[in-house]
Structure formats: structure tokens, C-alpha cells
Amino acid sequence: MERNSKLINKKFIQYLIPSILTIFAMQFTSLLDAILIGNLIGSTALSASAMCVPIIYIVQMPGLALGIGGSIVVGSLLGKRDVDKANKAFSACIIYGIGVSIIFAILAPIISRPISEMFAEDLREDIYQYVFITLLTDPIIVFALLMSSFMSVDNNPRLATIYFIISDILKISSMFLFIKVFNWGMYGASFSTGFGFLVGAIVIFWYGFSKKRMLKFTFKIKNTFIDLKESLRASGSMAINYLLTAVQMSIINVVISNLVTNIVDLSIYGLICNMVFVFDLISGGIVGVIPTLCGIFNGEKDIYSLKSVTKKIYFMNLISAIIITILVFSLPNVYSILFGFEFVEYQENANMLIRIYVFSFIPYELNRFTTNYYPSINKNAPSYLTVFLRELFFVLPLTLALLYGAGIKGYAVAQVLTELLTVICTYIFIFIIEIKNKQKKSLFMIDDIIYLSYDFSVDNNILNASKVSLEISNFCIKNNIDNRSAQMIGLSAEEMISNIITYGYKNKKQNFIDVNLKKIDNTLILRIRDDGMPFDPTKYEIDNDEKYTTSGIKLVESITNKMQYMRILNLNNTILEINIGGK
């Protein structure tokens, strides 16, 4: 018997689609946001909103970084079946994330005006309005970002998608109302984001009553920082990335707003800066499943699933990046028209700069994969290297040098060089580490299994139950495990799989069950994973009145030393342990 990826592929698609829809909704809304600002308020306002991006990175960092890092840790803990620690990590992220965002909100009246004064005079009032409301509504937005990440990892990816779609619809419709009808200008443009997330939060109440939910908020404030440590470690590269990005973008924006006095060039700069929303329309959603899937599979030490999913994410991300690059390169006119670019006589110049800048997209997405993936498998070095190379060593020197030498064109070229050089250096570093550690020189740095393990999959044919028992028993005996332990674990597997096939599937379609047996020290650990109806065998009680019983479960309980159950990724995970030799 061999392992296949059919069960995991099905689950991958079930998580990938909501992730793509979520990020698509976010990025598409950001695109519409910029389009509405450019068309309803003007090109100067669009440039001002581009200047505000670094501030948005900083104030939303608690939600963005802790959301990703926290979901990696929570997913890993759920994979290790430690629900109590997962609840503590989840609660700590919410408490500290909201706490930091409240500080930003309190500082809004104090720091908004000084921030706007750093920029060119024509942009100051628009920047002040946008920054003030962004800071004021930050607690709402951070809460939304955190909850969407945790809902995804906690068996509810569709709810996270619904939350963003509802919030984004409310944002765009209210933005039009606030700008066009109420004439609130940039106040309205910024306030619409917080308004959308606030009203859309009704979805979080649905999550609270979800039967699939495993995470629970704990109100124990004591020792929350200890519970936060792992999440901070996992989100460290993300946080540094957002912080350094904000710092270098702030420096570049201040230089550009004072160096480039031509309103046409400033408008083109606004066009280029907003291209990141186009970049992430599809690719962002593909990378977005990394914390959930890779974090959980790494926690479970399910190497087969981790390798399978990682390769799919990497190559899908690369292919989508290539497709979007070709589309934008071919249709720069469409892009600039959408954003309300008013200077028709300078269209060719705008097209040239768009075409240069779009070549940064493929290496940009490869770098995004690096910063998201490696923390999920507890290999932070490549992620940190990517962040420091891109945000410190390359982007500022190259951008400032080329800006002074070639203006906005120099800025576009600098971004391409920055992303490309970062990818090359990071990949060289990864392969050096793999060679040094005598690994197989894999880009994904997945460690080999160091214990006895056997993976295979079976379809939901009742005849397979007895075959599984024989397969497992033979494997154990071949690997010098005593006959009694081999028979006990084989019998347990047969009973559990028979129960899954008989009662877990209502339809007669072919479904697959993944089986993993591993020997750690003197313990045999059997994990059975299926996508049948939710059923917790540890809570099963025989009912004398029911027509059919699964009394074999009680037999399994009596012959195993430990039985655990968890519903992870909307999959039943039953774990049985037997001490070898009855020890």
C-alpha cells in the first residue's frame, strides 16, 4: 500500500479557494478604493493615499504579523493536539494585538498633523485626513485581521472569506456615499474601511456558535506574554518586514514628494505604488494558505502532506505571477485609465514605467513565499535574510541612487533590481545551508524523518479494513516490533477504519483515508485521517436502543494505551497509542 495525495488535494482546494477569494476581495477592494479616490477626489488625492501606505503598514502590523504568526503557532499546536496551549496563544494574540492598536487610536489627534507636515505642501491636508481616521479606526481593523486568520486555521475558512466579502462590499458602497454624497473627501475614504469591518463583524458571532470551532478565548490575563512568545517568534520576520518596509517607504515617499515637483510624475508614482494590489489579487490568496496548511502539517510531522502542499503552493504562486505580469505588461493603458490618470499626453511615459515596474512582480512573489513559508516550518533564517536584504541592503541605496539619477524611472528600475537580487541571494543561502546540513539540497528545507514511519492511503471499500490490519502487522514484524504489539495496533486500525467506512460516508463516492504509523521511542502511534462525518470516538457511548453500534471502539479503547481525537482542517484525526511490549 502507498500514500497518495487525494485526500490532501481535496482539502487543499477547500482551503485554497476561500483564501484566494479572501485576498482577492481585499486587494480588489483596495484597487477600487484607489480607483474611487483617483476618480472622485483627484490624482493628487491618489498620490496622497500612496504616501500613506507606510503608515498603514505600521498601524496594521499587530493584525497582519500576529495574525500570520499566531495562526502558524496555533495550527502547529492543534497539529500536536495541544488545544489548551492553542487557546492561550490565540487569546494572547487578540489581547496584545488589540492593545497596541488602541494605543495608535489614542495617539491619532497628537501625531497625525506632524506626520502630514513631512510631505510636500500640496499633499499635506489629504494625508492628514487619511492618517487621522486610519489611526482612529485601527482597533477595528486589527481585530478583523486577527480573527480572519484564526477563523481560517480553526476549521472555518469560508467564514473568514464571507467576513471579508461582506466588509469589502460595505466599504466600497459606504466610500461612494461618504465621498460623493456627504463630501467628506479623504476622511470618508479612510473611514469606509473601519465602517465595513465594524458592520461586517456580525460574521464573527456566527463563528462563535460554529460547531467546527475548536479555539476558545480565555480571559486569564496572567502570563499572557509567555503565551505570546511563540507567536512573536513566528511572526518576527513578518513584523520586521512590515516595519522596515514602512520605514524605507516613508523615507522614499518624503524624498519623492520633495524631489519630484512635477504633478505628472507624482501621479505616475501613485499608479506604480498601487500595482501591488494587482500583484496580490490571485497570488496573495495562494500564499495565504501557508500558515494554516503548512503550520498544521509541520506540527503533525506529516512530511508527505507538507511536501505535497508546499510544492503546489510554490508553483501555483509562480505561474499566477507570470500570468499577471504578462497581462499588465500587455495592457498598461487599461491599468492607468482605471485609476483615473488624467494626463493623456504623458500616457506613453506612464506605460513605459508600468512595464518596467511589472518585472518586479515574479521575484516579489517568490520573496513573499519565503517570508511566509519558512516560519511555518520553524526555519526562520531564510525569511529574516529576505527581509533584511530587501528592506535594508538593497532597496534604499538602489532607490535613492537611481531616483536622483533618473527620477521616477529610476524608482521603477530599483524595485526590479531589489526583488531580483534578494531572491538570488536568499536561494544561494538556502542551498549552502542544505549542503552544510547534508540534506538533499531542497529549496523547501523539509527535514527527513528520523524515526520509523509508514504512510499509506486506502479508499472507502470495506474490504480494505482487514487489508490495513494485515499491512500494519506485517510492517511492525518486519521492523522487529513484538508480535503482540503488532497484532494490537493492526486490530485497532481495522476496527477504526471499518467504523469510518461504515458510518462516516453517506454517499457511495470513492473517498480516501490516510493512515500513518510511527514508532517513537517505545510507543507506536497510529493516526487515521478521513473526511467523513464528524465523529469523536473518545466520547462514544453504546446505546442499547440504536439499530447499529460501533462497539469495536470500546475494544480499541481497552487494548490501546491512549486514544485522542481532533477535528483539524475539517478532517477527523484519530490517534491511537500502544506501548511496545505492553510497557
Where are these regions (language model features)?
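Flexible, glycine-/charge-rich segments associated with ATP-binding catalytic modules
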Residues: 441-456, 558-583
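Short runs within selected transmembrane alpha-helices of multi-pass transporters and secretion channels
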Residues: 67, 71, 133-153, 160-168, ...
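Transmembrane helical elements of multi-pass membrane transporters/channels
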Residues: 14-33, 133, 167, 196-200, ...
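Small-residue-rich hydrophobic transmembrane alpha-helices
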Residues: 46-104, 144-159, 268-327, 366-383
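Glycine-rich/acidic phosphate-handling loop/turn and adjacent ATP-lid/helix
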Residues: 526-550
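Conserved short strand/loop->alpha-helix "switch" segment adjacent to the catalytic nucleotide/phosphoryl-transfer site
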Residues: 473-494
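Helix-terminus/linker motif at the lipid-water interface of multi-pass membrane proteins
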Residues: 28-47, 116-121, 177-184, 243-274, ...
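Short alpha-helical transmembrane segments in multi-pass integral membrane proteins
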Residues: 1-16, 74-137, 181-235, 294-359, ...
